[in-house]
Amino acid sequence: YYYYIRRIVIRPAEVLHDAASALIKNDMDDLENFSISVKTGDEFEELADAFQFMTVELSEYIKNLTVVTAERERIGAELDVATQIQSSMLPCIFPAFPDRREFDIYATMNPAKEVGGDFYDFFMVDERHLAIVMADVSGKGVPAALFMVIGKTLIKDHTQPGRDLGEVFTEVNDLLCEANSEGLFITAFEGVLDLVTGEFQFVNAGHEIPFICKSGGFYEPYKIRAGFVLAGMEGIRYKAGTMQLEPGDKIFQYTDGITEAMNSRNELYGMKRLEETLRKNVHKAPMELLPEVKADIDSFVVSAVQFDDITMLCLEYRARMEGIS
């Protein structure tokens, strides 16, 4: 009777125990070769079969998990690289021109969860001309970040004293089309302010229209032709426009990450709310204004995840440059 009990009950239980112990001892590193055989025709055999099936399923799960984890790590590393590329290319030391009394400028870029290709720039074209750039590259990750570097570099290199900005964007567009294997495009706005006369020459390539605040007035959207995006089609000709700025006037430019910021109810922040926020803070200097706009966006979206960068720039023309005719 003992041997019967041992064969029918104890031995199958020992086989199951030994199999479980082997899995633990080997840290489940060899699940593919795991095998357990109990032929009793009862619940022990059913349990052994279930054990065998479980190890096969677990082996497949671990394989898939390894692949998914590796892919997530790759994507994470790529996004880190893209973030570093993006942030390293943007001027971020303020005040940017501490010795210049003719103007004040401030800009910020808050990257989204998925790194995009927003960029801004500002630089002296020569002693009396200040250029500002606001742009948004389509796509995400490293390709968008690298295309951002190319676009930003080309715009700055081709913005030369006395050049028409329409010609600048026409040349930049053709060059970008040649180096566009990913099929990306850039919306961009560039303006050059003559610090002596106050003339502001600008060109727009499918970008958001700026807000202008005249001295003593309020921020209002400045209606200009959007133009065609950069890198979208070769041979496009761009036309520059001009406006006259007086001391005390301000320009606010931004990317669509602001107006398209969305809350948990799928409502957009929108142009109207942006204009209201700018009007409430009309007397603030650029470095004070931009944090107020960002704070209002944050209060609107609350905890909703944003998938587009939030980028903005404000330029205040404070005084005419003297000593140059």
Predicted feature descriptions by range:
Residues 212-216, 262-268:
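Cytochrome P450 core scaffold surrounding the K-helix E-X-X-R motif
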Residues 8-26, 30-56, 62:
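HAMP signal relay modules and closely related sensory coiled-coil linkers
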Residues 163-168, 281-290:
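Short, charged, surface-exposed loops that flank catalytic or proteolytic processing sites
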Residues 267-282:
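Divalent-cation-assisted or electrostatically stabilized phosphate/pyrophosphate-binding catalytic cores
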Residues 292-303:
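Low-complexity, intrinsically disordered Gly/Pro/Thr-rich segments
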Residues 64-252, 302-325:
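… and, occasionally, acidic/histidine-rich disordered N-termini of signaling adaptors
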Residues 1-5, 156:
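Hydrophobic alpha-helical membrane-associated segments
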